[in-house]
């Protein structure tokens, strides 16, 4: 009946703002339902009756929560009833209002934007009451309210929340200072918010914020220090305010005045700011949206999400400052997993590139770039995370091809900020940037820096700036090229002034040059990156500004050449140089063919020239003639290679394959393939210069031979065309390097250029360069770093079919030993390939003593699987027991012994017993101890203590008698007895429980005296005796492990040892 009445009640929410299209979610329905339920319960009751009824109802957890939420609803929606309701809550609450605080925290975090105006004002009133009465956990609600005080938002609603929180902090300052984390969050938030309140209409609010924040910083500076480097970044944005200017001076010149343990601003810069503080400057809703974009949106489908985000959060001029907060959050908080990195989800660098490139405010743009590179300036590989510097390099690296303007502005900013951010500590900042770039290369975030630092799309000034700042990361040829050819584009050499000269940092108002720290706040920065457009085609004004008519003519000539070419590559300049070279008379035998090659530039004319040139001796050329031929040849071969798609699109279609090797350089390879005779010196010099001028020649030759042999074999099926490694050796000889080094270098370059072609060539490499490639760790690492699950599958197929042999048994152990420091995924792939080669365990078992549980889990896992398919042998057991034992034992050895005990218990027991017995001298002085059969003398032979340690840890692993049969066999019993009799007191004490498993040894003299040399004991009696002994041993061991929980193993061992000692004493007396 009551449910039917509640359904008929039409209730309009007074807590949430709802439109006609909004659907209520579970939270909203929960609050509404609790309010309606409470109203139905207390309607028409007096205060006393209501208190009595609620006091009984709150005893049930479910009703207690409903009543708490209902009261919270009333306090947030009815200002007149709120004080009385608060008193009622304090009377009936049985958890110190913890339930109300918890629900209020959740409400603020998830639904603050949907609260009505009345509810928001009542929220502030309720917070004030909570703080006044020091309700527990109210700081959680305050912290979530701070998060809702958004940056870049000067709307009246947001300003009301900011000022209300500020008033609470000022009024209850003592309470605030009692919570260090809340002090830190408050200071961090208000320093960020002050930046947005520069409008004269907000001056009174800003002054109140400044006064409160400065006093809190100075009085609680020991709590402020953990805020770290991002706090300094925020202080830069408010440095022009007089109070903060004085704080800056104290930070730099008089740090002890702030706190005795504070040593200066460099101490703050080396503290990484906690993620919680970076998170608190993003609205919870904004955080959810940006996290969704970085974790669920596919790369290429992000535009509509970015447009929505732009319209939602960047619609006002003040909102541009949010970009820095977002970039810092993405860099330090959003760290994608390996699965996400390998997926097609939009990467972090793409989001950051969008945030920077879409910014139209110069000041906000400079701050955004500083946020991107901020961790670079103080990077310490020992403490900092590479994920914090990865987006910076990737956004530049991936933008250089299609968006060179983004890369150039970021590179320019990085170069300038390295020098100007903190002049006093410029050397330390350079070390931080150097460490960043070095780790980026070590971890192979990008293959190398040359495509970025040496890109022809960068202007001359920026290339010079890069060379000055990052010379150690440039290739030697780039440094030499800068000296020989200062400008990659001829037109740039004549431009007198470019707008990029204006990209400098200006500091006004505060003389931060004397402090050594720049200021990137407000109007203090003039960054004109957005307006820079460097044109390679000079204007009429630029032509008029040159110094002479001759210079103008040269410029116009270059201009005409550039008009018909692509600005993005360097071909025009090469053609100009070629045309400007003076013509040199050559020998008649090559003059005609060389001219034809220079004119037509195709493979046919090139091979014809080579046929004429090869037999010529050195005497046929003057030095300048040979240099002329070589320089023109190398230039043409370089120019005629395609800049992109150098490899075939298809690996099967003859048309695509033939086209991919139709360029003149491949004509050289074809000529060498078809002509095996020894070359003259000029040809060798030409070949050497071609190799120097075209570093890719090695892997292009391998690619050519693969395709050429395939095509020729198809044309002539009766003749099989094979790789000719002699041609590759000629290339290696031309550069004066060993073939092994050349092969690894070329394959490394090929893998970075095109992984699919590298894997396609791999079987041929291992077949034709068998002696070099097999068991080659360097080649193996190149292969493992680029393969995925499908590639591993294909490699295993090739191995199984006999088309690919990566390992051979001899020397494999050294290869695996060097691979132990590979990445986990690489090692798992390696072991699958090893298993596909059917490598016997004996070839690699010597590694067993070297593997450590903490450092080599991948290898130990595979070895354990191999051992499960093997029978225990003397050699394997010797190697396993030679492993170092830790205090907690060796789980690897224990696991192997446990599964062997299930099938080979007696054999295993005999092997271990023989190994243990061999560690002690023979009991008979007249007999020389002979090593047990199958045990070889080796440096890996375990000591007696090692064997006992492993047996002891194995004993501890046994429960309720399982696996204890290892100790009951006669050989093991005698071995333990021998070990006991030859051990010192400390060893006996250490392994007392293990020795207690040995049955009492019968007197040797009595046993031997009872039988004559020529007599043989009846077999039945011996069998019965042995059976009785084994049964007795088994029962004794079973008794130890099957005892109930109340029995003490140590007490049993002590009593056992006492009994053993008595029996030994009696036996000795009988023997005497």
Curated annotation (Swiss-Prot):
Superkingdom: Eukaryota
UniProt subcellular location: Nucleus; Cytoplasm
Phosphoserine carried by residues: 1042-1043, 1047-1048
Region (Disordered): 920-943, 1002-1072
Primary location class: nucleus
Entry's Gene Ontology cellular component terms: cytoplasm; nucleus
Keywords, in A-Z order: Cytoplasm, Nucleus, Phosphoprotein
Signal peptide: none
Record's keyword annotation contains Ribonucleoprotein: no
Presence of keyword Transcription regulation: no
Cited InterPro entries: HEAT_Ints3_C (IPR056518), INTS3 (IPR045334), INTS3_N (IPR019333)
Binding partners and assembly: Belongs to the multiprotein complex Integrator, at least composed of IntS1, IntS2, IntS3, IntS4, omd/IntS5, IntS6, defl/IntS7, IntS8, IntS9, IntS10, IntS11, IntS12, asun/IntS13, IntS14 and IntS15. The core complex associates with protein phosphatase 2A subunits mts/PP2A and Pp2A-29B, to form the Integrator-PP2A (INTAC) complex.
Family classification: Belongs to the Integrator subunit 3 family.
Biological role stated in the UniProt entry: Component of the integrator complex, a multiprotein complex that terminates RNA polymerase II (Pol II) transcription in the promoter-proximal region of genes. The integrator complex provides a quality checkpoint during transcription elongation by driving premature transcription termination of transcripts that are unfavorably configured for transcriptional elongation: the complex terminates transcription by (1) catalyzing dephosphorylation of the C-terminal domain (CTD) of Pol II subunit Polr2A/Rbp1 and Spt5, and (2) degrading the exiting nascent RNA transcript via endonuclease activity.
Protein name in the entry: Integrator complex subunit 3 homolog
Source taxonomy: Eukaryota, Metazoa, Ecdysozoa, Arthropoda, Hexapoda
Gene name of the encoded protein: IntS3
